UniProtKB/Swiss-Prot annotation:
This is Citrate lyase acyl carrier protein. The modification O-(phosphoribosyl dephospho-coenzyme A)serine is found at residue 14. The keyword Phosphoprotein applies. Belongs to the CitD family. It comes from Salmonella arizonae (strain ATCC BAA-731 / CDC346-86 / RSK2980).
Amino acid sequence: MKINQLAVAGTLESGDVMIRIAPLDTQDIDLQINSSVEKQFGEAIRATILEVLSRYDVRGVQLNVDDKGALDCILRARLETLLARASGIAALPWEDRQ
């Protein structure tokens, strides 16, 4: 999936997450996580984000994650919404998911 533009998904409310994405000129993934629960769940948050990016074959992006204690399902939903917005597609290819 090609990320074409800046996009934001989520809020800074307790129990939610705000994620910002921007395209990069390289194929790197620049992931910055700021979380109120980073000591306990930082690695799990990072793993979830990288799993979703891998599933949709996303590379060459900068991600800024401001987590306020979001559950894993919320993190995934926000990230998938963000990818759809940033790539300019109306919906993700659900039928291709495994």
